[in-house]
Amino acid sequence: MTLQEIKDQVLAGFDISSAQATWLANMADSEALYAAAHEITITCASHEFDMCSIINAKSGRCPENCKWCAQSSHYKTQAEIYDLLPAEECLRQAKYNESQDVNRFSLVTSGRKPSPKQISQLCDAARLMRKHSSIQLCASLGLLNEEELRALHTAGITRYHCNLETAPSYFPTLCSTHTQEQKLATLDAARRVGMDICCGGIIGMGETMEQRIEFAFTLAELNVQSIPINLLSPIPGTPLENEKALSEEEILRTIALFRFINPTAFLRFAGGRSQLTPEAMRKALFVGINSAIVGDLLTTLGSKVSDDKKMILEEGYHFADSQFDREHLWHPYTSTTDPLPVYKVKRADGATITLEDGRTLIEGMSSWWCAVHGYNHPVLNQAAKDQLDKMSHVMFGGLTHDPAIELGKLLLPLVPPSMQKIFYADSGSVAVEVALKMAVQYWYAAGKPDKNNFVTIRSGYHGDTWNAMSVCDPVTGMHSLFGSSLPVRYFVPAPSSRFDGEWNPDEIIPLRETIEKHSKELAALILEPIVQGAGGMWFYHPQYLREAEKLCKEHDILLIFDEIATGFGRTGKLFAWEHAGVEPDIMCIGKALTGGYMTLSAVLASNQIADTISNHAPKAFMHGPTFMGNPLACAVACASVRLLLDSGWAENVKRIEAQLKEELAPARKFPQVADVRILGAIGVIQTERSVSMAYMQRRFVEEGIWVRPFGKLVYLMPPFIISPEQLSKLTSGVLKIVREM
């Protein structure tokens, strides 16, 4: 074996073996080892340095006999003794550390575990800190159970720290009053309640290099992503007071090995690092340290935050604005106390996204399915610039303008012939709201005010606003929390006949029975035609739409198509209704309408709908968004629609579809995979179990691709301008990561 082979193995995403790690530990050329570890660090690990500070919230004599610990009651040391600090003092120190750009603040207590009263006090302190500070909260409080950890998590503590300290084979030599199995039980409980975990240990306690390797592999098996590495500072009075300090070369070699074994983790320098020379500290940052506990430690002095920051920046790491982002910006579908990771983007061009750290990602999501032309397109850029020189916005009430008129002229030839009226809206969700209101007002105007409810199919998604949520699946959808507050709609099973399979006539029966029973109160049936998007990425048979249309006409019910996600070529047809040849009464479009540049949607309706509403009091449709018909958005939309029609979109989508079918096919044989389905420029891998979004997204980024999975779905919706080579990188990266599950 060679260093190059082992390094390439890690860079390719494969784990190394214990034998390979031992070979690395014994190689003579330390500098070559450090350089290889550095390459792994800059390729696989985060470049954004993570700083944590701690507060020794309670110090005293502990019943455990850990040989390294100054707070053990078994040894005579000079460690301070004091009870739990007041919550106000914890807050004061948390706010100070936040002002120093520290990411995390950890509450630490001595002893096996706090009393129930102290747990309650610590929860109160956490709530106080969350109320007055945005710093992320961690805790290291000993061997806790799931109930105690859940209380802490509810109070705002998002990460739990419990060190295994050393290799499983060596731990009993250092402590006999508790076991590593008890520590592992605490870590497992923390994960079950939704906490992230932090777990590492101390080197230099008499263990061998082989045992350090064993320890690093133990942490890798646990998939720990925050690994504190403490250097023993022998404390007078403890059994290890005369332990010889490790050489700087041995410390650096250990860090390198930890990086080879845990390539993506935050290796967090913690206690004892003050014994290193500045040169060795810089070398440690070079080799693999990308995180640190700053300030004073528990029983040993630490370092000044300002000094640490200066050195960290000089070694090529950065403190991005993502800290402010984490603390103050609430991203979609995530927590503020334990947010999903975000990756800061520097720019985007074509089918690529460039992160602030320089990494380039192939775009697989089209920014939630809207950027069909890719990014930074000169035609769309110019359209926006030209319109800015004229006007960016005027109200659409009582005024009109060329961009809105021109966009309407472009859209009408593309949509069903019966669609003759266009109502501009702000977003996809708002378009659905408008469509539902339009249906209700239509029946009111038609003299049937009792027809004010809706029917739809399960596993649907129509948006995040109030009435849009009401027609999303109330059980499997993302809005079940609001179910008891939303208007009650009628839901029938989604058709299981595949788009490219045989049609089962029985699939229409539940819809027929529901419509027959409730037709007098139903205003409309709303459907995502052919493709159910965020509700499950399912492609159903076109015959369902034909049968549904017959039922709607037979029972005097409007048909609404939500083409927000499917419109503008995504399914291989310009709009998905074309697969079935079924024309709706009302249709919603959005997302790709502006090529992903600006938010804009439109609701299209027949003359019958519009005229009926307009000829009955109040003789107007009662909806008017502030930014309705925004001229800047309309101008870009005009350019986007023209660009799509002139770009050979149909050939591009056929090419993408063929390549997705060929290159995702191997996933059908994976034991982790339940289904693979392709339609147009949509590729879906459905897994047997739910995916970890944070973990898989990080792995996708490491592969140089941008994919955002959810639930049991890993899917691709690339821009239509993606090259075959870029698409191959996407598909190969997806297959690799799914295979790892």
From Swiss-Prot:
Xref: SUPFAM superfamilies: PLP-dependent transferases (SSF53383), Radical SAM enzymes (SSF102114)
Positions bound to pyridoxal 5'-phosphate: 428-429, 562, 625-626
SMART domains listed in its UniProt record: BATS, Elp3
Chain residues that bind (8S)-8-amino-7-oxononanoate: 368, 461, 591, 624, 708
InterPro entries: Aldolase_TIM, Aminotrans_3, Aminotrans_3_PPA_site, BATS_dom, BioA, Biotin_synth/BioAB, Elp3/MiaA/NifB-like_rSAM, PyrdxlP-dep_Trfase
E.C. code: 2.8.1.6, 2.6.1.62
Start and end residues of each Radical SAM core domain: 44-273
TM stretches of this protein: none
Function according to Swiss-Prot or TrEMBL: Catalyzes two activities which are involved in the biotine biosynthesis: the conversion of dethiobiotin (DTB) to biotin by the insertion of a sulfur atom into dethiobiotin via a radical-based mechanism, and the transfer of the alpha-amino group from S-adenosyl-L-methionine (SAM) to 7-keto-8-aminopelargonic acid (KAPA) to form 7,8-diaminopelargonic acid (DAPA).
Protein name: Biotin biosynthesis bifunctional protein BioAB
Gene (UniProt): bioB
